[in-house]
Amino acid sequence: MQFADSRWLAKMVAAGACATVLSAAATAQDAPTADPATLKAQWERYTADAVANPVELAPMRVTEQATAADGATLRLVSLHPGVNRWHLVERVAPEGRAQSWHLENADAATWTLSLTKGDDPALLISGRGEASQCRPWAGETSELATAAGSGLPYAPVCGGKLFLRNKVAGSRTNREAVSDFLRKNVVFGDKLVNLIKGAFFEDAFLETAALGDGSGDNGDVVAALGQARLDRRPNMRTAMGLPVTGAPDGMEAGSWYAVEGQEGIFASVMQPGLIAQEILAERNGANWLDGVERNADVYLAAFDLGRFEIGYELGTDHPGLEWSSRPSRRGAEWNMAGPDGFSRADPLVRNGMLNPALLPRVAGAIAGGFKRDHGAFRFGDYAGFNRGHHYGFISNGVTFSRLIENLSTLYITTDGEIGMKLWQEADNEMIPRLAFARQNGVPLVQRDPETGASVPGDRVTSWGGGNWSGSAEAQLRTLRAGACLREAGGRQFLIYAYFSSVTPSAMARTFQAYDCDHAMLLDMNSPELTYMAVYRQNAAGDGLEADHLSRLMAESDPWAGGVRVPRFVTFSDNRDFIYLLRKE
C-alpha cells in the first residue's frame, strides 16, 4: 500500500518537526496540543493498511478527556487544531452507552475549544479576551438533542459559537426549517437549493457562438492575465452567464474581462479551433481536434487568489468512501469496506453545505470531481496497483480518502498556500498541514521541467490510461470542466473552464493557450455536474443570487418563492464542491 513506508514521518517526529507544525498553529490560537509520542502513534495509524473510520485519518488530532461526578466520561477530539473547524464530542455514560456529536466552529479565527476537568466538565470556548463554558449534553432534554432534532444541516449550540452538523438527505432536507434559520441568523437568507438530474448525451450541451469582426476597446482585460495564444480573436456572443464590463458588442476571444460587481473575478471565452497553430500542430501528447470540438464554446472564469480563500466540502453522498467497481480487488481487500478500510464517515457527519457563518464572505462555488465509482481506474497500469488509484480528498484537515501518488491534486494548507500538482509519495510529508485537498485523475497540462512551457500531460491521449470516461454512449467528446492554477504578473489565479463538447486533447490545448501551470479534469456530462457560479447579494438584501458560468447551469438551481436558489451554499447537496471566500 502507498503509505507502507512511514520512516520519513518517524524522522520528523523524532526531530520534533511534526510537533512544531501543530504547535505553531495551536500557539497562535491558544489551542491544546498533542505530544510528539502521540503524534507519532497517530501517524503510524494513518499509514496502516486499513483503518476503522476517518477520525483515524486525522493524524494531527488532539484528544482531551474528563470524568464527571456521575462517572460519565467526556472526550473532546479537536480533529486538526491548525484548521480549528471540526471537533468531535463523545460521552460515555456510566452504564457504557456512548454518544457522539460532530461540532463545527462558527468562527475558527476567533474561538478555540478545550475541555475543562473536574466533576462537571464543560466545553471552554475562548477568544476575544473572553471565555465561556458550555455543557450542551446536559439536562433531561439537552441542547444537543434539540439541535439534532431541528432538521437543520447546521444547528447552532453554545450561544451560536458552535454548530452541530446533522445528517441530512442532500437536496431533500426540510426546506422550511433551513430557510427560516438562514433568514433569522445570516445576513443572506430565504434561499434554498436542490439538485436536478441532467441527461447524458454526446454534444447535447454543445454551444457555438456566432463570430464577428475584431473587437474595439478591451481596457478591462486584466493585465497580469494577458491574452490566450490564439491565431484569431473574433468577438463572440455566447450563452455565458457572467455579466462582464467593457464588452457591449461581445467578448473578444481569448481576452479577459472583469465580472460586474465582483472584484478579483474575471471571465474569458474562446473556441479550441482559434488556438494558435503552433500549439495545435505540436506532437507533444495531444490529438488533432475534430470539427465539432474546434467550434465548441469554452467559458472560463479566473479568480485572483490574492483576494480569496479556497475550501472544499463533501456532499452528503458523493464522493463515496466505498470501493469503486472499476479496479479488481485482491485477497484481503475483499474483507475491507473501502480502499482505506471504511465505507462510512461515522462518527463524522457529511452535510453537503457551506457553514452558514461563511455566507457573508462566499464569492463562488464549483462542483467537485467524479463520484467514487468513477474515481478509480478500470484499465491501464494504474488499475493494477495502489488499489486502482481511488481519488483522494481531505476536508477541514480530515482525510476521508487518502491522497494517492500519480494523481492531479488541488490542495490548500493550514497557512493558506494553494497548489495544484501531480501527487508523489514524498508529498505525503505535507499531509499534517493540509486543510483541504481534492484529486481527480491525471494532469491535462504541466510545466515542462526543461523549457518551462505548458505541455499536455503524458496520458491525455490514453482513454483508459487517463480514466477520461465519456458520455453514456462511451463517446470521449462530451461536456467537460476543468481547473488550473497559473502564476502571472506576481499573482496567482485559479482558472475554471467549462467546455461545451470536447475531448481531453481540446482541454489540454486550451489550458496551454492560457499558459496554465497545472490543469486537471473535474466533472463532466451535464451542466449540473460542471456547475460553477459566483454570488452577489440580492436586491432585497436578504439573500444570495447566482450568476452562472453557463446559463444552462441555472437549471439545477430550483425555484423557491419565485426566485432561483443557488446550490451548495444555502442548502445541502449530495455532490461535493469547492468554494471561494473573500479574504477578511
Residue ranges and their predicted role:
Residues 2-13:
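Bacterial N-terminal signal peptides that target proteins for export
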Residues 11-23:
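Bacterial N-terminal signal peptides
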Residues 24-28:
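Sec/Tat signal peptide C-region and signal peptidase I cleavage site
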Residues 29-399:
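Zymogen propeptides
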Residues 291-295, 401-404, 474-477, 569-572:
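A short catalytic or substrate-binding loop motif that flags glycine-/basic-rich loops and adjacent residues
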Residues 438, 444-447, 454-458, 468-584:
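Extended C-terminal subregions enriched in glycine
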